[in-house]
Amino acid sequence: MQKNIENVLITGASSGIGEALALIYAQNGAKNLFLSGRNVERLEKIVAECQKSGAKTEGKVIDVTDKAAMEKWIEEFNQKASLNLVFANAGVSTGEETPKNIYNTFNTNVMGVLNTVTPAVELYKKRKNDSAKIIAITASIAGYHGLCAGPSYSASKACIKAYGEALRNSLRAENIAVNIICPGFVRSRITDKNTCPMPFFMEADKAAGIIYKGIQKNIGLIAFPWPMRFGVWLLSILPNCLSDFIYSRLPHKV
């Protein structure tokens, strides 16, 4: 069981899962919250709500694809309060699979995660005390198997899922916990644009509650809801001829 998660940094905190997580940590004893997002008004609103719950909260509009800016931001706040949890949550959907959108998806969903996780890991390695040192990465159920409705999105999430799983094992000896989150369809600005069916759709606060409990228990892979997790896992182990047949009958647009 993880204890003393007092200083928390969350990217993509101005909506969806990130916003809901910020509120949960503010309501459950976090002393310092450092939040980033792309929308000033929404970010200011969530900062104010977290402060009402008693957490000292600072927000910053920052582009996670900016490596130098992310390093500076993370180091700056670690000096103010030794970080216990760094949550690489920011991500985008692809929309139409144009070259521009494809590159943007990988830059944000993959490089954005690396730009968040890498400086945090280096800071954690230098810390020799017993305080909590946690990395959390938001991947997706779509990362279990490439979905025809979103090739770039699925591939980007598969990349960070595999990265997180490997990182968890490689950092175990350093007493650094790594949790990989693979949610299904959760209310966010991304799913608000979806026109395809979204089975087992979940509100952000419910999803955040599952994630919070999973991190507290240090569960390596927090994937939900379980019917979707089982379904995509099953598809991933089927022979290609069968999985191709099934996918040919699924929606080709998200």
Placement of each model-derived feature along the sequence:
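Conserved glycine-rich Rossmann-like NAD(P)H-binding loop of the short-chain dehydrogenase/reductase
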Residues: 30-46
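C-terminal helical subdomain
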Residues: 180, 196-233
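Short alpha-helical oligomerization interface
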Residues: 96-107
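Active-site helix of classical SDR
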Residues: 117, 156
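Active-site loop immediately N-terminal to the catalytic Tyr-X3-Lys motif
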Residues: 145-152
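Residue(s) in the substrate-gating loop at a strand-loop-helix junction
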Residues: 140
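Conserved glycine-rich cofactor-binding loop
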Residues: 14-15
